[in-house]
Amino acid sequence: VSSKNIFVIPNGIDFQKFSPKKNIPRIPGQIITTASADVPLKGLDFTLEAVSKLKKDFPYIRLVIIGAARAGGHTERLIQKLKIEANIVYKTNLTKEEIATEYANSNIAIVSSLYEGFGFPVGEAMASGIPLIATNVASIPEITSTFAELIPASDSKSIERSIINILSNPPKYQSRADEGRKHIIENFDWYKISKSYEALIYRIIQDFKC
């Protein structure tokens, strides 16, 4: 296929729903991550390992996981092995509005996936205006640009180090998060994306008009 016949149009992010909420205070030490499926591909193990290392110096640290663990499964056993049950909270069956509230409550978002398609949690975290740590894989750097802490996949040390950096200098990373929200609004607006599809469809019709 010729490159002139390839068009890339991203998905959009609902930046009105996922937004900073002045009436919702951030909970000190709260970190949020999404594990829509309890599978290794989500890289949750590495975030859990980082939390286990941090809890000594940051005993108030709390990881909110949007998703569910399999009863008696690998993740549940790992949490028990690391002795971090008190630092982990699972939230399941949430509406989009409730997920947006969890983001607004949090100080840091982590996407530790080993692979992602578009990566909606990345864009939703950025739209929420909170500092983001994300793996430098697949489409993630295309979404984040320079507005997130990009780290290697499968690297709990990098997650740990990034969390310490953010908790140690909130103003610096909050400023970048604020710019990250602007980046999402400018580049992942559903209205602009719909206009891109409209223009592309019109062009195709014109090109193939008999």
Could you tell me what each predicted segment is?
Residues G12:
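Carbohydrate-associated surface elements
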Residues I24-K42, L48-V51:
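Conserved donor-binding/catalytic core segment of Leloir-type glycosyltransferases
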Residues T34-A35, R62-E76, T92:
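Glycosyltransferase donor-sugar binding loop
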Residues E76-L94:
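Nucleotide-activated donor-binding/catalytic signature segment of Leloir-type glycosyltransferases, i.e.
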Residues N93, T101-S106:
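Short alpha-helical donor nucleotide-sugar binding micro-motif in glycosyltransferases
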Residues L114:
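Aromatic "clamp/platform" in nucleotide-sugar-dependent glycosyltransferases that forms part
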Residues P131-A134:
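Short hydrophobic beta-strand element within catalytic cores of glycosyltransferases
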Residues E149-S156, N165-P170:
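Conserved acidic donor-binding segment of nucleotide-sugar-dependent glycosyltransferases
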